[in-house]
Each structure stands twice: as C-alpha cells, then as structure tokens.
Amino acid sequence: MKKATAKLLLFFFCMSFLMVIPKKVNAAEIIPVNISVKYGQTEGRKIFDMINEMRTDSFDAWCWNADNETKTRYDNLNELAYDYDLERIATKRAAELALLFDHGRPNGESFFSIYEEEGITYRAAGENIAMGYRTAEAVNAAWREDGEPYNGQGHRRNMLNPKFNCVGIGHVYLDGCHYWVEEFAYRTSVNTTETTANDSEQIMSLSVPKSKVTGLKVAFDKTSYSLRTGESTEVKLTAKLTVF
C-alpha cells in the first residue's frame, strides 16, 4: 500500500496565478487509457468548510513573508463559493494523478488546459494536489502547512489567495492510494447548482502519449487447460498496462 510521502517530495504548487500558459504542442500520438477509480466526493467536500474556516479566522489567515520573520495577515477575506464546474475538473484531475502525480497532465499539457477542455472560463486559477492521505482532515492539515517556512507554504497561499472566489475539490481512490485535488479560481459566473456527491466506482478514459505506455501484462484465469480433440473452453484474460 502506498504511504503519504514527505511533503517536500509529495507536493507541487503553481505560483503563477494570473499567467496565461500557452497550450503545449505535442507531436506524440495520444491514445486513450481506461482506469477504474473509486470516487470519494462525500469525504472530499468536507475540505470546503475547512478552507473557509481558515480564510475567515483572524488567527489562522496568515502566511510567512520571504524573510521568514514577518507575516502577511489576510483580514476580511471573503469565503470561497463551491463551484461544481471546478469539482468536475478536480475529480478528473484526481484520476489523472493516479497515472502521473504532477501538475502536468498525462497528455503532456499543463493543468490549465483542462479548463479549456471542459469549457470553463476563469480569470485566475491555482491547483493543490496530494496523494496518500486517507481523510479530508489529514490532507487539509498537510495543505495548511502551518509549520512550514515561506518556501513551503505555496499550498497555504493558494488557500488564502484573495484573488480567488471559488473552489472545487476532487478525491479518488485507486490501488490502495487516495488522490486529492483542489482547483481554485476567480470566475465571474460561479456554478453553485448542487449535485449529488459521487462515491461510485467508474471507468475514466484518460489521454496518454503512446510512448508512455511501457508495458502490457496478460494473465490467464488458469495455469493450464486440459482439452480433448474437438473440445473448446472459455478462457478469461486480464490485461494490465504499465503507464509512465
């Protein structure tokens, strides 16, 4: 079973909230790869209130400055709205993390590209990702980075960024490991139409460069089959792809 890795190795963060990142040109052949993931949105949505509790608490709403001696305190931050469009892309990104744990997507593009792909407009965006934490409380505590210096508080700055007005959270489970995503944005039109939390098991089709499919293992349901001349039998095969 995978374990939660030390934060310096586990987490990455995007600092360029307002930067327009051009779509990456990739000549590699892209193929679909299907993976079966278990969604955990009931648990994932618990983080929403935790974010707003930190944003509106005068004691908690702070970050270190680069000198690690003085703090920026965020007074009168607005609560974020929960955006169900952002949740949709956060859950897809969480599934992608099971293939490639990075802000870059398995198809070779930046995470920003999923906004265009899903037709979601925004003026600013940021993303927090994590893996290995079993509960909403545990991953939120890691993202808060209370005890980290300035260089280790990128996720915290995302959570407290006054330029964001909404968030969506994604959580999936695969092969004994939990994957979590927070998608932050500033949007002029926030989708607050509530949907039922998805806790089902579903097959996701993800785009991957063909060159990243590095192996194929096929397993039979039996080690041997005994047949007489003219007889037939049903053989069950299980195929497993190795990606990245």
Question: At which residue positions do the language-model features occur?
Answer:
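Surface-exposed, proline-enriched loop/turn segments that connect beta strands in immunoglobulin-like
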Residues: 220-223
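Proline/serine/threonine-rich low-complexity linkers at boundaries of modular beta-sandwich domains
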Residues: 203-217
